[in-house]
Structure formats: structure tokens, C-alpha cells
Amino acid sequence: MSSGAGSGTTKGGRGKPKATKSVSRSSKAGLQFPVGRIARFLKAGKYAERVGAGAPVYLSAVLEYLAAEVLELAGNAARDNKKTRIVPRHIQLAVRNDEELSKLLGSVTIANGGVLPNIHQTLLPSKVGKNKGDIGSASQEF
């Protein structure tokens, strides 16, 4: 008697076929973000009467890309501040220092994010020793 390895059934064709393991749509698309949950949100949100099969996959991919981009920049900001944990301040610095993300999230307030450090040029002390340095360097040429 055959073991049924090729036919997908048990006991030589008798009995119930073995159930195949279900594969999520996220893993089929190679994503970490939940495609099924986003599909459920799209259907429940009444954005349209019907939702295509590819729409939640595409939206999941876009959201995953944006999250990865923000997390990479925030991780760099945390490393620059010699920290190992990303806090809202690092996310704020990452978003506001990136031109495209700042434009995308321009009207968004990040809680506990603080503000960007910025001192106006007129408030900074002026360089007085600039002219003396030029004279000194000219005298050194002789």
C-alpha cells in the first residue's frame, strides 16, 4: 500500500485528505504588516462599496515602507544622541530633518517630540577676529 505522499490523501486514497497549512496574505506578499487586518479596515471604513484584492496588499506595502523609513532615520537620531532606545524625540528629529517626510507630516504633532534646535543668525555672536586674522596671515608671507 502507498503512504499517499504524492496524492495528498491517507491510506492509499481512503480517508480524508490532509489539510494544507494556511499561508497568510502578508507572507505571500513578503510583508510584515497585516494584509488581512488592513483589508478588514478598508471594508469597515466604507471608503468604497467594494475593495479589490490587491488594494490591501499595496496599502500594506506602502505603510511598511513608510514605517521602515521613519524607524531607520529615528534609529540614526538615537545613535547620534548615544541612546539605544528610540523615543518620540528621535522620531520628531528624524521627521523634521527629512524634507519629504516633513512635507508629508507637516500638520502632524508628535507628542513629547519637542522642537528642532534653531538659533537665528542675528542672535549668534559675530566673528570679530576675522580681519585681524587676515592681517596676521599677510604678515607671515614676508
Swiss-Prot record:
One of its GO terms (cellular component) is nucleus. GO terms for molecular function: DNA binding; protein heterodimerization activity; structural constituent of chromatin. Phosphorylated to form H2AXS139ph (gamma-H2AX) in response to DNA double strand breaks (DSBs) generated by exogenous genotoxic agents and by stalled replication forks, and may also occur during meiotic recombination events. Phosphorylation can extend up to several thousand nucleosomes from the actual site of the DSB and may mark the surrounding chromatin for recruitment of proteins required for DNA damage signaling and repair. Widespread phosphorylation may also serve to amplify the damage signal or aid repair of persistent lesions. SMART domains: H2A (SM00414). Pfam families: Histone, Histone_H2A_C. The [ST]-Q motif constitutes a recognition sequence for kinases from the PI3/PI4-kinase family. This is Probable histone H2AXb. It comes from Arabidopsis thaliana. The lineage of its organism: Eukaryota, Viridiplantae, Streptophyta, Embryophyta, Tracheophyta.
